[in-house]
Amino acid sequence: YYSYSAKTESLPFYDTFPMTLVVDIDPINGHFSGGNLHYLRPTARQSIAKTWGSGSISYPMRCHHKYFIGRASNIRLVPAVDLRDFVPLPSEQFVRELGGVRVEIPSSFIWSRL
């Protein structure tokens, strides 16, 4: 997981504290991509995290996102063994930038759209 600040204002919303299984890194274009658990409801999140803890790298495509490397900070690696006993905490924070002002978007709104 890490802190993230989106670069573009064209996004309808983004997660400021993603928990992502990184599956691709593109250093030439300066981005990485993977499955962000926070785009899943907590029960689905827990199930997917447990499969990651067992070595799987699959996830629903609705949680696949691309991130700019330079916009990620405070990166923390979660050992796979810790994902086996994963308990979803409400650590996601979805926001939208409107005229330079950051507005929080409820998680339930995000989950209902995906």
Describe the function of each predicted region.
Residues 10-50:
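Basic/aromatic-rich interaction segments and small domains that mediate binding to polyanionic partners
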Residues 1-12:
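Short coil-to-beta transition motif at edge beta-strands of beta-rich domains
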Residues 39-114:
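Intrinsically disordered, low-complexity, charged/polar segments
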